[in-house]
Amino acid sequence: FVFTGGHGGGSFAFSQAIPAINQGLKPNTISTDLHTGSMNRGMKDLLNVMSKFLNIGLNLSEVVTATTWDAAKVIKRNDLGNLSVGSVADLTILNLRTGQFGFVDTKDKKIKGDKKLECELTIKDGQIVYDLNGISNKFWNE
């Protein structure tokens, strides 16, 4: 049984998600339906979707597991979503920011949250492909 927290252009509403999570019905996968209509509205990107779930009742471990390992198992790709011998060398280092953030659903309704995930570094097939703050680089005077 798969209960997904898939968020696209029309399939995610706080009015349904928050009561469901409050009653113990948590998604076992978190994903997006990425297209210009969804990324330019409330969905934005996968980290924004993950951040929404952090702010409506899931803990960090639940959010990361549902987005990575549990999602990979659903599509029968045990080589993805984990760090083990023989798995694909894809890795993302995330920052958990705290502050005041706003999140919008597909019905143009919003919530305020105090947690937001931000990508610090991405490694794809063993190669650094994104480095927000240059953490993989040496300082100029080294």
Regions inferred by a protein language model and the residue ranges of each:
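Catalytic metal-binding/acid-base residues of hydrolase active sites
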Residues: 7-8, 35
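His/Asp/Glu-enriched, well-ordered alpha-helical/loop segment
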Residues: 13-96
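C-terminal cap of metal-dependent C-N hydrolases
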Residues: 88-141
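Short, low-complexity, polar/charged sequence segments that are solvent-exposed and flexible
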Residues: 21-24, 48-52, 110-115, 139-142
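A conserved active-site cap/scaffold subdomain adjacent to cofactor or substrate pockets
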Residues: 1-6
